Amino acid sequence: IQRIGKCGSRTVVLLLRILSEKHGFNLVTSDIHNKTRLTKNEQMELIKNISTAEQPYLFTRHVHFLNFSRFGGDQPVYINIIRDPVNRFLSNYFFRRFGDWRGEQNHMIRTPSMRQEERYLDINVCILENYPECSNPRLFYIIPYFCGQHPRCREPGEWALERAKLNVNENFLLVGILEELEDVLLLLERFLPHYFKDVLSIYKNPEHRKLGNLTVTVKKTVPSPEAIQILYQRMRYEYEFYYYVKEQFHLLKRKFGLKSHIRKPRPRPEFFIPSPLETEEPIDDEEEDDEKWLEDIYKR
């Protein structure tokens, strides 16, 4: 299971920890959280570790797609969840600055070196004045997780988009939508019952729901309509990928007789053709893997 920042991965990992004890499988959660791109040797080492681990088990990490067959290995079962790109970006923007409901000082733990002027930078200023954090290539975030380790996967454009779509079709058992998480969990329970049996009932448990509220990012504000439209334009390829995955997910749901019971989505944004984008280094995911506190509370 790849973990994409601010796409519900902490909720999923908490569920997996409960399920691993209930069903007797191993859960391996990597303690490396800010290295999604690997050298060839690092890829080979990680593939070796995953391929030789004691089964049955699930492995989770923030890492871009790895092609096991390229190194002579058997391709594993890939699972992932993505989210509306603008909502993901806004959640990450404020999470880096102010954390979540676990405590007022949570943001100080996560970004202790952040300057005050950066921490309190108005989101509209960041977007409208084209600050690096609110511009490409840093907004090109979701697609590289599916495109893979090739350098061109970090360049916003059609090549990375099409390669990401191809990998979704050929290498992923399921790519779900966070906005429809209950249906994602229901499909996982059908596809992989040894791992996910009863996951939906656990997720709906009032105690779990109460804990889930603690991971909600605080102090989020909504950008102006002008700023939102600019984000849509800058995230053109992210949205093309998001809607492609969403359509594939809905096809899968219909195949298994699931009906959507979700709020009406916002209309698709209208995009203009952007000017060529320079390739720079996107920021790494700064979300720390800190779910142990959730697990401990749940077991009290």
What is each residue range found by the language model?
Residues 10-12, 88, 242:
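General alpha-helical segment detector with a strong preference for membrane-spanning helices
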Residues 1-54, 60-65, 98, 148-149, 163, 198-300:
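PAPS-dependent sulfotransferase catalytic core
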Residues 33-80, 87-202, 263:
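PAPS-dependent sulfotransferase catalytic domain
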Residues 14-18, 190, 247:
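Short, well-ordered alpha-helices that flank and scaffold nucleotide-derived cofactor binding pockets
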Residues 1-3, 174-175, 228-229:
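A detector of helix-start/N-cap boundary segments at the beginnings of structured domains
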